[in-house]
Regions:
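Short glycine-/small-residue motifs
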Residues: 115-118
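Short, basic/low-complexity N-terminal boundary segments at the transition from targeting/disordered tails
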Residues: 4-18
C-alpha cells in the first residue's frame, strides 16, 4: 500500500489552490473548477469543493472543521522558505524553530485555517528517519 494523496475540502477552491501554489511553488493541475491537485514527487495534495462531498456520502466532510491534522511539507531549507514567504506577506503561526525530534519547522495556516508545517530535518537522526 502507498500513501499517495491528502484531500482538503473547501468552500473556495481557487483561493486555497492559490495559497498552496505559493507555499509549494508547484502549479496545480485542474481537473474541474471544483477539483485541483498539486503533485509533488512524494505525495499529491488535492483540493476539492464542498460540492464534491456528496459523492462520498452526505455530510462526510466539512471545510475548515479539522483542528487535528497538520499538512506537512519537507523542504530543503526552511529558513530560506521563511524568507520567501515573509517577503510575500505570509503570517506565521510559528517562526522557524528546531523541534526536539530534529526537524526545523515553521507553521502557517492556510486560508481555511488548516495548520501547515514546512520543515527541514537538521539532526543526523531526523535525516535518517526522513531518508527515502
Amino acid at each position: 500500500m502507498n500513501f499517495v494523496s491528502l484531500r482538503v475540502i473547501t468552500d473556495d477552491v481557487a483561493r486555497l489552490v492559490a495559497f498552496y501554489e505559493q507555499v509549494t511553488t508547484v502549479g496545480a493541475r485542474w481537473a474541474t473548477p471544483e477539483f485541483a491537485e498539486l503533485v509533488t514527487p512524494s505525495c499529491t495534495l488535492a483540493v476539492a469543493s464542498t460540492g464534491t462531498v456528496a459523492l462520498f456520502g452526505a455530510d462526510s466532510a466539512r471545510p475548515a472543521a479539522n483542528r487535528t491534522a497538520i499538512i506537512e511539507f519537507r523542504v530543503a531549507d526552511v529558513d530560506a522558505e521563511h524568507r520567501r514567504l515573509a517577503a510575500a506577506g505570509c503570517v506565521f503561526v510559528q517562526e522557524p524553530t528546531t523541534m526536539p525530534w530534529g526537524n526545523r519547522s515553521l507553521l502557517v495556516r492556510d486560508p481555511d485555517g488548516n495548520l501547515v508545517n514546512l520543515f527541514t530535518p537538521v539532526t543526523a537522526e531526523a535525516l535518517q528517519r526522513q531518508a527515502r
